[in-house]
Amino acid sequence: MSFDLDAVRAQFPALAIQDNGRRRIYLDNPAGTQVPGGVAAAMSECLLQSNANLGGYFASSAAADEVVDSAREAMARLLNASSAREIVFGQNMTTITMHLSRSIGRLFQPGDEIILSRMDHDANVWPWVLMAKELELEVRWLPFSPETFEFDLHDLDELLTDRTRLICVGGASNLTGTLNDVTSICARARAAGVLSYVDAVQSVPHVATDVQAIGCDFLVCSPYKFFGPHQGVLWGRLDVLEQLEPYKVRPAPTDVPGSF
């Protein structure tokens, strides 16, 4: 399928910026995309028309509630969530993961095990390592082949024990571009009664993402990887989110998703 490349480029004001008379080239584009004019306009309108705390009994607060509710509905459609209540917004994926690790950790006991991967971005590694240190958990590492840059799921089968409580894995590697078979990994986790946490920051921009088909318990992504604002999004299975005790101040909502 062909498309008008010039028309697409025209949607991104940042592509018209020049330095010393030459068009700017964004070599860091994989780390974060530029936003289309429509996104910048929507963000500007939000700041001008609905810049207020949520949950208030006045017009700008009601408008802010509507913006957030609409955004949750949009992300729920993108990820095929069963409910917009399963969508949580945060500063970025790293911050969300660090925050959620504090809540998930309350489910575990000293001596429990978690499985991490050295293929993953540190945002899906270090929060869990810190959690493990604080709670006296054992970290087990899922290796990958240095030839194929893929996981051998037989290795995962050997790592799973009756003490395993959590598996954290990336949907796609930001280093090698490997698309991991997260559906099979999450199926093994589910069969063993283990929670699964998928870092889909690099995969959501490139492949259709269906959390129901993947079968994970949590999935995180970053809208600024696909032309949105610099923010993080967590999808969590509603019944699992409702089991967690969120880290929050007392005035914050008590119900999911606002409690997170």
Annotate each PLM feature.
Residues 1-260:
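Pyridoxal 5′-phosphate
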